[in-house]
């Protein structure tokens, strides 16, 4: 993934976040015979032909479980998600390679396979247990998003009412243990105070696996400039998400209106399963889709504030329904790179954005492990 690109070469992508495992669970209870990932599967945003078309050479597969699952149920469901990623790679062994290290990623790409890594989404998946964290690392997890849409006992979520104002002492211990094990601390979804506390505590690069720039779209899931400005000192990477709510203020406002409707009906605006039907019900009121240029604006803003070495891509495909026109699935990355090339990005710049920066951060994270 580190070879020199020419203007004609596809830009290799190591994407930070894809929710295909949960989509397959919901669609067919993990039955790989019931889904057409080789021929092309229109019911999802990710399949093998479209990964190839998008230049995706590596993917962090999210092993997300919803916050409605707690305690042992959340832990069990996360193990089931991890097991699915193992089975996915074993089933499509000619196309995918399960990876645990940056060296593994390089080896997979050298054989023409998509490097497949595991990312956990939400601290509820470990049930406040460092033992569970260690076990999931042993099973291949290489990042943990500290929260999802709801607070955990040791960290505040960006989309919940703050309780702690940041990380508790257990939360700080979680960050330190992740550093020791060799796992990325993922700060997407967390409250601003958690971002700042984690950057203070972490002795290894952090990532935002799927977040965009708050200066351009005022959404709590996006990253404020003062936090982006800390990434050079930490070595971390903000991997820009392509979800419409994060790229366009008009879309963010439409989303917030749906949250208000959910609350007025006695539903939980933090829960996707409560909000998604309202979004679909109100789809006729949705703004025009964001553009590829909107996605490029966020990438360029992160570059301007944090520096070229600290920006990547984390599409969040199969984790959302709304994306820029032309980038509705994993085949769309080349359109982003074409737009950035038009704006003056060099082939070397694009190689860093697509995969080089997160691989460098991964090597640094591994070196910091004990």
For the regions a protein language model found, what residue spans apply to each?
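Histidine-centered catalytic micro-motifs
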Residues: 13-20, 190, 208-212
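Short, surface-exposed connector motifs at secondary-structure boundaries
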Residues: 114, 175-183
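Charged catalytic cores and adjacent phosphate/nucleic-acid-binding surfaces used
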Residues: 4, 202-204, 213-215
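Catalytic beta/alpha-barrel core
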Residues: 96-99, 183-190
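Active-site glycine-rich loop that binds ribose-phosphate moieties when present
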Residues: 165-176
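Distinct, well-ordered alpha-helical segments
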Residues: 129-133, 194-204
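N-terminal hydrophobic targeting/anchoring segments and the immediately downstream early-domain regions
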Residues: 1-167, 218-370
